[in-house]
Structures are given as structure tokens and as C-alpha cells.
């Protein structure tokens, strides 16, 4: 089926095709273009709308400017029995982190657990996509990254010195959806702010503040110079700091004042850092028993007493529901984003979404 502008729905295959075609046009090899398209589409399918095709114009701009390498030589170095460091050669973060996940799974098969860092990587999109990669090997996955720009202050601070450095963990289940927690360390992700700006939706009054006055900012068009607040106050700021040190500093990637703003400085190399952890649950008990226990707890918790008019949700429930719906029905893309993607398709000489 083709995109239906009346319904506002775009088939997943059309989105994937647009991403892949644009990557090919800027010199990305076919196999890499397919991998990038797969991972970007997965972000859209699971509901991480600010990390899928929404990012395509930015990625294309960086590839054109040369601040992202379209043909990186990604290498794995400093490998030990349970650790490794992936050097991304300034390639697309999707390629670098997926290589890190593959390496972590391979090492964890031998050692039971592996931690793999990334340096000279780039923006990779939704954290939950990468934490979930070890699920395919029946392993627990964890992921964190240094965010693509600093928008958040330390506790009591008035300077944006921290990114929204995300963390995700994915735990395999049997018949139930896997448990997947994917969180920014800010009260909301900055991608959410950008989505609100794109759709002209007011911000919640506890999301951003004016750095001069401390007053709430609710106009999404005034967000560029506002401070994004950490989740749970100093706790969220502390998590952002520690994840930044582990994903950035530990790997020789950038963190803190050194970070390059992915959005405002498109011509500069970001040297983004990430890490992936893979853990084999069969080293602790029989795999099927563990997955059955995850199922049992999931059902018990999901069926617990809910507040009036609400239902109990577990991390990963909405993700699984959205994914099934969007595969079946297509993706709902904002009108402004459709305009941007149509303009990009025209510039790149590829089919627009509605033509696919």
C-alpha cells in the first residue's frame, strides 16, 4: 500500500525506503544504508518518534558536509575476554552501536557478560533500540550514550552542561513482551521538545526553565535557550553525569563542556560515546525458567489493582503495542515533518513518501 495523505498514515516500508534511498544518495554503501534504515525505522515503530525518520534531514546534512563519514572503517580494539572498544571512524552512530552490540553478544557467549564502549561514533537514535539488540540472542541488554547536545544543568546550576544522557535496559521474556525500560535522564527527552515545537504544542510547565529567572518556559518556540530539567531533580542530574562519564570519558569520547552540539554545529565532528552491555541469563539459571519467571511476574504486576480509569503498564508494554499497530496500519507523521521530508526527497532526487 502507498502512503495515504487523507488518513495521515505512511507504510513502514515507505519510510524505510526513503531513508535507505537518501543514505545511498550521500555515498553510504548499500549494506550500511539498509542497516541504518532498519534501525531508524525501528525507532519510529516503537514510538520513539523523535529518533526515527524525524532525524533524516539532520543526518543527510551532516553526511553532505563531511562531519559524518559515509564510509567508515569501524574497528574493534582493546578487546579483552569481556570488554572491547569500538572505534567508529566518525560513522553513523547506528552502524557503530550495532557493531558494539554484535561484539558484546559474541563476548558474552564466551564470558557470560560483556561491556563494549564506542568512541568516534555519532548520534544513534533511540536507546531502547540498542538495548533490545541482545534480546535476539536471549540476552539482557543495556545501553547508554552521551546525548547529542547539552541542554540540562547540574542540581542548582544555571548552565547547560549535561546532555539528556539516556539509559535503556531490555530483559527477555517468554510469551509476554520483553521488559524494556528506555529513559532520558531529563524529565523528557529533548527530541520531545523538538516534536512539540514542530507541532506547535505547548510544553508542560515543569519541563523547561529560563536560565536567567528560573521561570517555567511553556512556549516551544522559546526552548532553544531554555534549560531542560533533569528527572527527579539532583537524582536525574547525577545519573546524567555518571552515564556521561561511562559512555563518554571512559571511551575517549566527548562529555560535558567538550560536547559538540549536533543540531547547532552540523559541520563539526561530534565524537559521540556510547556503551552496550550484554548479559547471558543462562549463566544464572536455565534460560526457559528465567523467561517463564519474567512472564509470571509481568502478568502478576500487569493484573494488579489499577487506579480508577487507568490500567497498569509495564516498561515495554506500550512499545510492543505501538509496534504491532504501526506495522499493521502505518506511521502517523506530522504534516510539518511530511513537508520537510518531501523537500528532502526533492533535493535528493528520490521518490516522496506518498509515491512509495
Annotate each predicted stretch with a short phrase:
Residues 8-14, 28-54, 68-79, 268-271, ...:
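N-terminal glycine-rich anion-binding loops that anchor highly charged ligand groups
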Residues 51-105:
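Active-site cofactor/substrate anionic-group-binding motifs, chiefly glycine-
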Residues 83-174:
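A generic, well-ordered mixed alpha/beta core segment in the N-terminal half of proteins
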Residues 190-255, 269:
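Small-residue-enriched flexible segments
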